[in-house]
Amino acid sequence: AYSYAMVDDSRLVLRVLQESISAGGTAINYSKVSELLLEEGQVQGVVLNDPEGSDGIRLRAAAVINATGAWADRLRNQVNPEKRIRPLRGSHLIIPRNLMPVTDVLTSLHPDDKRGVYVYPWEGTTVIGTTDLDHDEDLDIEASINNAEVDYLLQAFNVQFPGHTISRVDIISSWAGVRPVIGSESSKDPSKERRDHAVWSDNGLITVSGGKLTTFRLIALDALNAALPQLPNAKPFSDERVFIAPDLTAKEL
């Protein structure tokens, strides 16, 4: 069921960071890699923007993994100019739950392009999504839904649920995200691009991109194992360790 893949993404990210710190890692918030440290053509670390200075903070590392999503090509361009990422935008609408009080995930095909559109409950509201189109805007500007996407999602909902028709005045809010899809020369239709993840190694820089949040552990495992040749004392990584769910109710979380 689709409901098995529903997750609070912000909590998931924080949990992963907490697990990393507990294992001896260091998390540096509000930091941005401005350039790669190169020695004899090989990546040996990164330079972080220093909010309190102009020189930047130089960090050396045995292995550097570029897991920057839709921005992956921007960093990778310093060692390989080949473009691999096709940024695709997915947008959602949020409406009051009483207008469509679903208790599980419902899916249907859009009447125009036969793409899957989902309606599901979330935090006391109902969400309608998603779209799938090339995101040609500046990646440094937060992505947002456009008018055509709003019409697209409203049409899908109203065709599927003629007894619960809605309009723009019913929309509480919306959000949009940019998918780091691996581009191909064979597909012009965004929805026909493969959603697999891929890992590349360029002059010591490991880049991982693509995939879906539901397979984030496998994606991380493949990226870590790709870095093994640069970590001579490390053992092959495994996916045996799992998160231990806290003994709390949903309200206590």
Question: Where does each model-flagged region fall?
Answer:
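Active-site-adjacent segment of FAD-dependent monooxygenases/related oxidoreductases
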Residues: 1-7
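C-terminal catalytic lobe of FAD-dependent flavoproteins
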Residues: 9-11, 15, 19, 74-78, ...
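Conserved N-terminal helical subregion
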Residues: 14-22, 30-33
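Short, surface-exposed charged micro-motifs
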Residues: 26, 35, 60, 116-118, ...
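A conserved short coil-to-beta-strand element within the FAD-binding core of flavoproteins
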Residues: 29-44
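Short, hydrophobic/aromatic-rich segments at coil-to-beta transitions
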Residues: 42-46, 103-104
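Core beta-strand elements of the Rossmann-like FAD/NAD(P) dinucleotide-binding domain
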Residues: 52-63, 67
